[in-house]
Amino acid sequence: MNVAFLPVYANPYQQLLAGGLARAGVVVTLLPGLPSAAWLRANRATTEVLHFHWLYGLYMAQWRTPWQAMAFLRRFRLARELGYRLVWTAHNVMPHRTAGLGPLHAHVRRLMMAEADAVIVHCEAGRRELLARYPRPGPTAVIPIGSYAGLYPGTADRATARAQLGLSGAAFVTLTLGNIAAYKGLERFAAVFSATAAADDVALIAGRDRDAGVVRRLRRAAADDPRIRLHVGYVPDDTVQLYLAAADALVAPFERILTSSSVVVGLSYGLPVVAPALGCMAEQIGAAGVVYPPGDEGLAGALAAIKQADRAPMSAAARAIAANLSWDDIGRRTAEVYRAAVDGAT
């Protein structure tokens, strides 16, 4: 079977999924963006399934968005007419940045839910949330994000990592990892941390700049509180492993979220996770951390709880969760979704 992923982004999720699919007998072509009409016609004989991931980049194009959105709708219709089977993984219910175009985003998602041959979500709560907003007659499969164990080097132990980062062995260190953007809740976290943390606590915040305003305010917070250590930009793998090895817990203080690869990264490296009770968080984390009611009070309580907790059982639970997230199993289950769509079992 031959499948095309679109759009493809520079993150490990799609590469790891493609590897799992390859071992399940599926050949994956990676399309960086919206395919042309010519590509759709030329490849129909050899490609059975178009697997859509993050839809935003297929129909949004700054000032050209009206034309890009129309092109997306035309290609979507053409793909249906040509007989491609269409699968969508709903990584989120709505994009993290709506750019004032909520009706457009909702229309695209209603279209996908109505016409895709299959939809994949990463947890049961995500399925309920998606179907409540966009009812759908066809199948909606639950397939989790796979483990990221082994993705980063594992050569540094806790003591070595802390020494290289200039961190005290006695400090309580939290880590937030991933794109720096408004939906991540990092400004709330910085404020709550500054107001409640002990003198030797440290908050590591690392990730790419995806919102200049958020980064500017975080820089100000870090300048005012030296316990907040901010790394803005690309984080090399060797540095990621130091952060993961040095941290006592991963904090994912989202304002809104469905599912999170950064949470799975933390679990994969044995870190207890602190996250709000939103989307898939409770299902992803299980006994491997603290899930809190969204808001300042809930976050403050969760930070206190994770610091005081016996984190060894949480760390063991995190690794056990990740061990059950095999990409071979996820590839096999995803291939079954494709085959059901192609066989008309939808």
Task: Kindly give the residue locations of the regions a language model identified.
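Nucleotide-activated donor-binding/catalytic signature segment of Leloir-type glycosyltransferases, i.e.
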Residues: V215-Q241
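Acidic donor-binding loop of glycosyltransferase active sites
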Residues: L242-L258, S268-L271
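Conserved acidic donor-binding segment of nucleotide-sugar-dependent glycosyltransferases
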Residues: G289-E297, A304-D310
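Donor nucleotide-sugar binding/catalytic pocket of nucleotide-sugar-dependent glycosyltransferases
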Residues: A114-P153
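A short, well-ordered alpha-helix in the C-terminal region of glycosyltransferases
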Residues: T160-A163, A312-L325
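Acidic anion/phosphate-binding donor-loop and adjacent secondary structure
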Residues: L131-A132, S147-Q164, A170, A182, ...
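Conserved donor-binding/catalytic core segment of Leloir-type glycosyltransferases
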Residues: S168-K184, A190-F193, L204
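Glycosyltransferase donor-sugar binding loop
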Residues: V202-R216, G233
